[in-house]
Amino acid sequence: MSETITVNCPTCGKTVVWGEISPFRPFCSKRCQLIDLGEWAAEEKRIPSSSDLSESDDWSEEPKQ
């Protein structure tokens, strides 16, 4: 027997079946998938880090020789 696994859409919270029946998983639809992508592109979402890359001593506009 196989159990039906369900998750909540991260955008709208709707229940989504985790399987081939849901091609946009974990999202419920292409719309929710694109909303999430837009939030990442607009930098509304980010992965936390311990330091800011722009303040790093290793960051430079010029390539090292």
Curated annotation (Swiss-Prot):
SUPFAM superfamilies: Glucocorticoid receptor-like (DNA-binding domain). InterPro entries: DNA_gyrase_inhibitor_YacG, Znf_NHR/GATA. Keywords: Metal-binding, Zinc. One of its GO terms (biological process) is regulation of DNA-templated transcription. The keyword RNA-binding does not apply. Binds 1 zinc ion. Residues 54-65 have a biased composition (Acidic residues). Its cofactor is Zn(2+). Residues 44-65 are annotated as: Disordered. Zn(2+) binds at residues 9, 12, 28, 32. Disulfide bonds: none annotated. Coiled coil: none annotated. One of its GO terms (molecular function) is DNA topoisomerase type II (double strand cut, ATP-hydrolyzing) inhibitor activity. Transmembrane segments: none annotated. Gene3D superfamilies: Erythroid Transcription Factor GATA-1, subunit A (3.30.50.10). Inhibits all the catalytic activities of DNA gyrase by preventing its interaction with DNA. Acts by binding directly to the C-terminal domain of GyrB, which probably disrupts DNA binding by the gyrase. Belongs to the DNA gyrase inhibitor YacG family. Interacts with GyrB. PANTHER family: DNA GYRASE INHIBITOR YACG (PTHR36150:SF1). This is DNA gyrase inhibitor YacG. It comes from Escherichia coli O6:H1 (strain CFT073 / ATCC 700928 / UPEC). The gene is yacG.
